[in-house]
């Protein structure tokens, strides 16, 4: 009974449902049963289905050993509701599924769930703020992107050190980095890290990035106590005092120094029920509805524990500060109760750890729209959270360091050369798109030469340069990029055409040189004539 791991990505809950249905229909043992003096072929009892499916789920890396028999019964009830199975008389949809000897069978066909058509939240790539960006609130659609192309003057300034020409420079401060710029850097970098860890081409199918608040991320990073718990600015969003006192009482059991009420037999069960009732009546789960798909997607990384922890760290940074604080306090209490050997049993039917998972999983993670596997997925996530909450709910140091260094770099004094463009010398990181193998081969062969060839033509066509300066720059270009230069000037003759030799001016002849040499007696001969 192998249940392949369903990795991260969109529609993971639906993919898990279809995978489980296919395995159940293909491998559930069928045999002959008798009921009320009548025999039925190719069927199974409810208890047999619970036994087999429970074992499958417990051995699956997608769900884990924490799956209870009760959850398996609930899942089979959903199978009956969705006509994955039917009772022996062909009834399905309205009947309740119970763990008994009732007979069930598979219908001739069991349709798999189609993948839901979700709105594409955001097709644009995540971008860093530029200095030329309009202020927040203005439209940023159809803004042309100016390619970064270096003209000949900038190129020769960059390479002029090689020939000993260092241009004058001065220190300048960059433009003021606004709070909106910093917030956008935090949001863009965090989402970029999450997208990279999940291995997705885009987050649009698992997360609506428009609902992600950069202010939440920054608050969750910097407004924390020495223990790493978020500190809220708005005290009205704090846990009620009586809930916080009850949580401290169970977390420090039996040393309840803050609890002034009299204790009695079963007191700890009533305190636990009080806490469970408060969390169970929250309007929204702690991990929020709009982050459900993101957290479910991260569950596909659980076989790689370290990677899963990093992904959960980033997802938890996106939570509202009040949700993150409530989650931190709840996980600390749950972990301490499970490790406390002096804590009396809080339930007669479950162990302490299983009780924690079953009680709080739905208030931590659930979908706004009913999802057939949300109970199992929530239990899997809460189990992993309990084992790794200290790592998951702390600020990822690598992310914080990367962003702080980038912000400091943007604010640092820069060296500027006359005529240089600061936005070119310090360009923001950009994101890539996938290209075809043919386009890649073309770019590898010609992509780097085309801009250089254009630069060479610009130098050749520059009429402001004297012949001496132009020859000097062409010689420098030839030394740096001989292949490009050779392609433009394949022969010395082609190079000579660029600098044609001017014809030398002949010396002016005097009029007397054109005459014949002086002949003696010339005047005498003229007399004779």
Curated annotation (Swiss-Prot):
The modification Phosphoserine is found at residues 160, 436. SUPFAM superfamilies: GTPase activation domain, GAP (SSF48350), Winged helix' DNA-binding domain (SSF46785). Residues 201-393 form the Rho-GAP domain. Keywords: GTPase activation, Phosphoprotein. Residues 24-108 form the DEP domain. CDD domains: RhoGAP_BRCC3-like (cd04405). InterPro entries: DEP_dom (IPR000591), Rho_GTPase_activation_prot (IPR008936), RhoGAP_dom (IPR000198), WH-like_DNA-bd_sf (IPR036388), WH_DNA-bd_sf (IPR036390). The record marks 231 as: Arginine finger. One of its GO terms (molecular function) is GTPase activator activity. GO terms for biological process: cell migration; intracellular signal transduction; positive regulation of Wnt signaling pathway. Pfam families: DEP, RhoGAP. This is DEP domain-containing protein 1B.
């Amino acid at each position: 009974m192998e249940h392949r791991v369903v990795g991260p990505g969109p529609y993971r809950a639906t993919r898990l449902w279809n995978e489980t249905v296919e395995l159940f229909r293909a491998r559930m043992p069928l045999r002959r049963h008798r009921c009320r003096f009548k025999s039925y072929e190719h069927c199974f009892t409810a208890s047999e289905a619970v036994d087999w499916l429970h074992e499958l789920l417990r051995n699956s890396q997608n769900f884990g050993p924490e799956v209870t028999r009760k959850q398996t019964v609930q899942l089979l009830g959903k199978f009956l509701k969705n006509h994955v199975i039917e009772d022996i008389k062909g009834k399905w949809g309205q009947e309740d599924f119970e763990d008994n000897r009732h007979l069930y069978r598979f219908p001739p066909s069991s349709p798999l769930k189609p993948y839901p058509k979700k709105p594409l939240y955001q097709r644009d790539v995540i971008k860093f703020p530029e200095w030329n960006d309009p202020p927040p609130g203005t439209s940023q659609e159809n803004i042309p992107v100016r390619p970064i192309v270096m003209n000949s003057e900038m190129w020769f300034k960059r390479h002029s050190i090689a020939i000993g020409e260092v241009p004058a420079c001065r220190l300048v401060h960059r433009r003021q980095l606004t709070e909106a710029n910093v917030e956008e850097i935090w949001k863009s970098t965090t989402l970029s890290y999450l997208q990279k860890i999940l291995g997705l081409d885009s987050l649009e199918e698992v997360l609506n990035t428009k609902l992600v608040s950069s202010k939440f991320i920054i608050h969750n990073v910097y407004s924390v106590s020495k223990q790493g718990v978020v500190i809220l600015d708005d005290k009205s969003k704090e846990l009620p005092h009586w809930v916080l006192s009850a949580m401290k009482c169970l977390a420090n059991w039996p040393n309840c120094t803050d609890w002034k009420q009299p204790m009695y037999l079963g007191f700890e069960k009533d305190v636990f029920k009080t806490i469970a009732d408060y969390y169970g009546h929250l309007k929204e789960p702690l991990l929020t509805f709009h982050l459900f798909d993101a957290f479910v997607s991260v569950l596909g990384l659980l076989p790689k524990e370290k990677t899963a922890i990093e992904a959960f760290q980033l997802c938890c940074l996106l939570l509202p500060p009040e949700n993150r604080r409530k989650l931190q306090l709840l996980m600390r209490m749950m972990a301490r109760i499970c490790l406390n050997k002096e804590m009396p049993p809080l339930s007669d039917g479950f162990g302490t750890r299983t009780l924690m998972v079953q009680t709080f999983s739905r208030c931590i993670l659930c979908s706004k729209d009913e999802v057939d596997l949300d109970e199992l997925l929530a239990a899997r996530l809460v189990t992993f959270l309990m084992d790794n909450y200290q790592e998951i709910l702390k600020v990822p140091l690598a992310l914080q360091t990367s962003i702080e260094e980038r912000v400091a770099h943007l604010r640092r004094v820069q060296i500027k050369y006359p005529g240089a463009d600061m936005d070119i010398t310090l360009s923001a990181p950009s994101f890539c798109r996938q290209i075809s193998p043919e386009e890649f081969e073309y770019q590898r062969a010609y992509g780097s030469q085309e801009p250089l060839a254009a630069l060479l033509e610009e130098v050749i066509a520059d009429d402001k340069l004297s012949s001496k300066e132009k020859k000097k720059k062409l010689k420098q270009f030839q030394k740096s990029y001989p292949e490009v230069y050779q392609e433009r000037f394949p022969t010395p003759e082609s190079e000579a055409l660029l600098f044609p030799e001017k014809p030398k001016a002949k010396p002016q002849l005097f009029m007397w040189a054109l005459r014949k040499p002086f002949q003696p007696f010339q005047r005498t001969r003229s007399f004779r004539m």
